[in-house]
Regions:
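Pyridoxal 5′-phosphate
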Residues: 4-148
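Positively charged, low-complexity/disordered segments
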Residues: 1-2, 149-153
């Protein structure tokens, strides 16, 4: 893992099989000490407990909507502002462009820079409703119940 070619370390936050959580902080430190970005896949953890991206000091974190009881085809990506400002969009169109000419284009301000074309409005409303549902139950209650179920085996 200490190769000079290392650019990104992407890791699951929580196993979907055993529910285990790897030593995120240690792996993150190792990645950053080698100049790599650290990206966390929170698909399993996001619907089970609260995640503090500042405490984890990740460069980016993502999770899918369907793991949050929401619709398929949508998810969430959070990334540090400096990373989002540095990277280029990979899909183009719509209101993501601030100004365009025959020889140049400038991107809209974040987050619109990455919002090409027509947004998935139905999926976004569905995901928001799913997150509201989880919030109503309470992540602490979900975590407590999961812990109790896991300890009974």
């Amino acid at each position: 893992m200490c190769s000079s070619d290392l650019k990104v370390v992407a890791l699951t936050h929580q196993s979907n099989v055993l529910g285990t959580i790897p030593p995120i902080s240690k792996i993150n430190q190792l990645a950053k000490s080698n100049g790599a970005l650290f990206i966390l896949d929170a698909c399993q953890s996001a619907p089970h407990f609260s995640i503090d991206v500042q405490e984890l000091d990740v460069d980016a974190i993502a999770f899918s909507g369907h793991k949050m009881f929401g619709p398929t085809g949508i998810g969430v990506l959070w990334a540090k502002r400096e990373l989002l400002e540095k990277i280029e969009p990979f899909i183009f169109g719509g209101s993501m462009i601030d100004d365009v000419s025959m020889t140049n284009a400038t991107w809209a301000e974040l987050p619109r820079k990455f919002e090409a074309g027509v947004p998935n409005m139905a999926q976004a409303v569905g995901l928001a409703a799913a997150i509201d549902y989880i919030d109503a139950i309470g992540l602490n209650n979900i975590d407590r119940k999961s812990t109790r179920l896991n300890s009974s085996h």
